[in-house]
Amino acid sequence: MRLVIATDEKKFFRQFLEILRSIPPLTKLRNRELDILAAMMYYNYLYKDLDDDIRGRVLNSKATKKDVREMLGMSQDVYNNNMSIIRRTGLIEKSGRLADALQVFPGTSYKMEFHFNIEKDVLR
């Protein structure tokens, strides 16, 4: 099956997470948490030319956190509570660095491929 999805840079990351939402640990996250994670992935993409450690520090900076909160229209307390939940899943480290699986840097297009290893059901 092949699907072509028209999108823009900001929406891409939320759509990416929505496609993967049925796979742990994303299954544990609610919509607001996915919104924050998508925004962090977007900023990670914007700063892709920076060294990995520096990019993590920029993502964890007060300025970036404020930008994300304003983009999503949430208070600092709500943001902090949701970030705590995201960090517990291991998708974002305390340093601000995103998990390797979320280090996504699309160009003008991005291709996802799925391989399912399906085990046969054993009848008893």
What are these regions (language model features)?
Residues K10, F16-I19, L34, K66, ...:
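Intrinsic disorder/low-complexity segments enriched in polar/small residues
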Residues K28-L29, M74:
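Alpha-helical hairpin
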Residues R97-R124:
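Short, cationic-aromatic polyanion-contact patches
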Residues I5-F12, R32, N60, V78:
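Non-membrane alpha-helical secondary structure
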Residues L29-A63:
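Short helix->loop/beta-hairpin flanking segments within DNA-binding domains
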Residues L50-A101:
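Winged helix-turn-helix DNA-binding recognition segment
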Residues M1-K28:
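Positively charged, structured surface patches that bind polyanionic biopolymers
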Residues S22-I23, Y43, M71:
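Alpha-helix C-capping/helix-to-loop hinge sites
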